[in-house]
Amino acid sequence: MAGTRSAARTTPAPDLRACLGAVDNDRRLQVMEWLKAPTRHFPPQVEGDLQRDGVCGALIAEKLGVSQPTVSEHMRLLVSSGLVTAKKIKQWTFYKRNEPVIRAFTRRMREEL
């Protein structure tokens, strides 16, 4: 338990405006929810493990019913806020929630509000 606390404290405080802007969209909020339980919301992938590597942007685009460029812009905002991480495998980008930053963001929201 102490290790968890220590790790949470070493996570830099996220930029509130960037995080709030990133989640100020129904589609991005939906993606954040899906990424909580990727094996429940996405089929197995040829490349990359859903849990370890994240979800391929092409699968997110398909599930949202949007084009690849549209999902790339949504994911760019989530990644730049720090709420999501991106990992390249071959020509694909895989996305995963950044739980330490999400915890720091929610903690900071409680403190600020």
Model-derived regions, located:
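Base-recognition residues in the alpha-helical recognition helix of bacterial helix-turn-helix
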Residues: 72-74, 91
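Short, Lys/Arg-rich amphipathic alpha-helical interaction segments
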Residues: 96, 100-113
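Alpha-helical residues within the helix-turn-helix
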Residues: 62, 73, 79-80
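Short, Lys/Arg-enriched C-terminal cap helix and immediately downstream tail that follows
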Residues: 82-84, 90-91, 107
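N-terminal leader segment of winged-helix/HTH proteins
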Residues: 1-34, 80-81
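N-terminal helix-turn-helix DNA-binding core of bacterial DNA-binding proteins
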Residues: 18-21, 27-67, 89, 93-100
